[in-house]
Amino acid sequence: MIGLIQRVSQAAVRVDGRVVGEIGPGLLALVCAERGDTVAEADRLLEKLLNYRVFSDAQGKMNLPVRNIDGNGLAGGLLVVSQFTLAADTKSGTRPSFTPAAAPEAGRRLYEHFVARARQQHPIVATGEFGAMMQVSLVNDGPVTFWLQVAPQAVRAGEAETAKSA
């Protein structure tokens, strides 16, 4: 599962001209399920995202997670937006292939699981609408942008086996 996270001072998502989700300071998370992903990958990505230290502490170092953006326990917002294009294969030609992305029904199920778990674990969660054409606006704070990826279990197992035989 892939997450492209951006530290924002504010962000909003609109569908058909209406705001469906918005946050103040926090993280905009564009998320994508890949073929082979399960709820285990969704849970690992969420845990990583919620604990990833991208907010500045009193010394100006990126040392604080979205759960505590001011160092005093203030949680930042989390705006979760589905974006299957993150799984694009761009290695050849001039047209991306989306074969690596999960099928739409699997992607929806994993996105909804991710959002439900986020709402259980974090106090401020807003979302876009899965499968909708959305307009996302944001003020990127920094800019600070990170690509987080949790490979499907089968891929991780294959990498471990390759490392053993090397």
From Swiss-Prot:
<keyword id="KW-0378">Hydrolase</keyword>
<comment type="similarity">
    <text>Belongs to the DTD family.</text>
</comment>
<comment type="function">
    <text>An aminoacyl-tRNA editing enzyme that deacylates mischarged D-aminoacyl-tRNAs. Also deacylates mischarged glycyl-tRNA(Ala), protecting cells against glycine mischarging by AlaRS. Acts via tRNA-based rather than protein-based catalysis; rejects L-amino acids rather than detecting D-amino acids in the active site. By recycling D-aminoacyl-tRNA to D-amino acids and free tRNA molecules, this enzyme counteracts the toxicity associated with the formation of D-aminoacyl-tRNA entities in vivo and helps enforce protein L-homochirality.</text>
</comment>
<protein>
    <recommendedName>
        <fullName>D-aminoacyl-tRNA deacylase</fullName>
        <ecNumber>3.1.1.96</ecNumber>
    </recommendedName>
</protein>
<dbReference type="Pfam" id="PF02580">
    <property type="entry name" value="Tyr_Deacylase"/>
</dbReference>
<keyword id="KW-0963">Cytoplasm</keyword>
<dbReference type="GO" id="GO:0000049">
    <property type="term" value="F:tRNA binding"/>
</dbReference>
<comment type="subunit">
    <text>Homodimer.</text>
</comment>
<dbReference type="GO" id="GO:0106026">
    <property type="term" value="F:Gly-tRNA(Ala) deacylase activity"/>
</dbReference>
<dbReference type="InterPro" id="IPR003732">
    <property type="entry name" value="Daa-tRNA_deacyls_DTD"/>
</dbReference>
<keyword id="KW-0694">RNA-binding</keyword>
<feature type="short sequence motif" description="Gly-cisPro motif, important for rejection of L-amino acids">
    <location>
        <begin position="142"/>
        <end position="143"/>
    </location>
</feature>
<keyword id="KW-0820">tRNA-binding</keyword>
<dbReference type="GO" id="GO:0005737">
    <property type="term" value="C:cytoplasm"/>
</dbReference>
<dbReference type="GO" id="GO:0019478">
    <property type="term" value="P:D-amino acid catabolic process"/>
</dbReference>
<dbReference type="InterPro" id="IPR023509">
    <property type="entry name" value="DTD-like_sf"/>
</dbReference>
<dbReference type="GO" id="GO:0043908">
    <property type="term" value="F:Ser(Gly)-tRNA(Ala) hydrolase activity"/>
</dbReference>
<dbReference type="GO" id="GO:0051500">
    <property type="term" value="F:D-tyrosyl-tRNA(Tyr) deacylase activity"/>
</dbReference>
